[in-house]
Amino acid sequence: MATMYSAAVEVISKETIKPTTPTPSQLKNFNLSLLDQCFPLYYYVPIILFYPATAANSTGSSNHHDDLDLLKSSLSKTLVHFYPMAGRMIDNILVDCHDQGINFYKVKIRGKMCEFMSQPDVPLSQLLPSEVVSASVPKEALVIVQVNMFDCGGTAICSSVSHKIADAATMSTFIRSWASTTKTSRSGGSTAAVTDQKLIPSFDSASLFPPSERLTSPSGMSEIPFSSTPEDTEDDKTVSKRFVFDFAKITSVREKLQVLMHDNYKSRRQTRVEVVTSLIWKSVMKSTPAGFLPVVHHAVNLRKKMDPPLQDVSFGNLSVTVSAFLPATTTTTTNAVNKTINSTSSESQVVLHELHDFIAQMRSEIDKVKGDKGSLEKVIQNFASGHDASIKKINDVEVINFWISSWCRMGLYEIDFGWGKPIWVTVDPNIKPNKNCFFMNDTKCGEGIEVWASFLEDDMAKFELHLSEILELI
């Protein structure tokens, strides 16, 4: 049995980084939106970007580590525009923006980046601040950054942002803005031109989705899934594993599914995310014990689905989850599908029809988000009440809930601090709550999808077995 790789980790320093200029008095109170209120304060999402030592500096005394002061100064400039991130949370209603600052760790990793990354189960938690790894540790800073410096000159930058104030799109915008500011500062750009104007956020979520008084009280918050801080216990046997779906396999499945699509969806080719989501659903369907029904909750970015659409740089949580499921007794029983399935159908065709049905249902639920205003309001109401994510039974059948979040097409592999593009970008899946959760991200080529899956140990073994069987079958 392979031994778990463990690098010696030494925390060199911890600092507080504040905005370069004070936040104006009229911006000192940043109101949360209704959607912000629905996310837990303790849940931080760590994004890790790996940058190898470049050829130009790998043989000399200068390397990425010499840029630490530049990283800090550019981060300070970036916080001027992302000022709520440097504030402190008050009573699930607003952020006190008196420039309290974010936490910044400088860490030395004894070993080479290539050795660290070559492990079958990469120990990503070693690159995170301890206060992020443990959900039960109280935190004040809404953003925690750790710069990990390897002996070889490579660097892994970990940015952890509280989900209370930011979704995946906002987290991506923040890191891209910081990198752009660093790169421009390195080349001698003027202070006024340091930040890419296209990456300056807009703050309109609270006006679009006003906060709820109900969600400021303990009783109101208790209705929201994940609102209570999870305990760190030795009994928690949740494990995480990385799965990579390459472009060739995704394309093969997509072409087979396209033939089956109903007429009203023919013009909409399945996306990579839809294909992989359907494969995940089918695998958990096979892994789910008899008498239970798996329900998949998929995060949906509202920005482009609003009327009129919002900017990509709109700050905050502008995402909801939509829920999709297919009871085993009704899978592949629609009239359209019955015409093509008969007693001689191969098992692979049956599975493809099931994937087709699931994608059709998921699209139908997502279409409600971008439909009329009333439909969108109902989706948001269900999300804010915790109804969708806390489903217990459907038609008297016990439900097992699964959550999927996609970071695809967010430009994470384009993030350049002046060292070139990262060789790997990933999300640490081990932050609680993580049981039955999936994180999707692009592979480096931009065509495949990397998935981090988290299950209890026994469930992981079942999921892995069934996923491999399905991929081999179709």
From Swiss-Prot:
Classification of source organism: Eukaryota, Viridiplantae, Streptophyta, Embryophyta, Tracheophyta
GO terms of biological process kind: alkaloid metabolic process
Disordered: annotated segments: 213-234
Associated pathway: Alkaloid biosynthesis; morphine biosynthesis
Feature: compositional bias, Polar residues: 214-230
Species for this entry: Papaver somniferum (Opium poppy)
Influence of temperature on activity: Optimum temperature is 47 degrees Celsius.
Gene3D superfamilies reported in the protein's UniProt record: Chloramphenicol acetyltransferase-like domain
Family: Belongs to the plant acyltransferase family.
UniProt EC number: 2.3.1.150
Tissue expression notes: Expressed in root, stem, leaf and capsule of the mature plant. Restricted to sieve elements of the phloem adjacent or proximal to laticifers.
Catalytic activity entry: (7S)-salutaridinol + acetyl-CoA = (7S)-O-acetylsalutaridinol + CoA
General function of this protein: Acetyltransferase involved in biosynthesis of morphinan-type benzylisoquinoline and opiate alkaloids natural products. Catalyzes the conversion of the phenanthrene alkaloid salutaridinol to salutaridinol-7-O-acetate, the immediate precursor of thebaine along the morphine biosynthetic pathway. Conversion of 7-O-acetylsalutaridinol into thebaine is spontaneous.
Disruption phenotype: Accumulation of upstream metabolites, such as salutaridine, but reduced production of morphine.
PANTHER family: F21J9.9
UniProt pH dependence: Optimum pH is 7-9.
Catalytic site: 163, 416
Enzyme class: transferase
Gene Ontology molecular-function annotations: salutaridinol 7-O-acetyltransferase activity
TM annotation in the entry: none
Record protein name field: Salutaridinol 7-O-acetyltransferase
Keyword list, A-Z: Acyltransferase, Alkaloid metabolism, Transferase
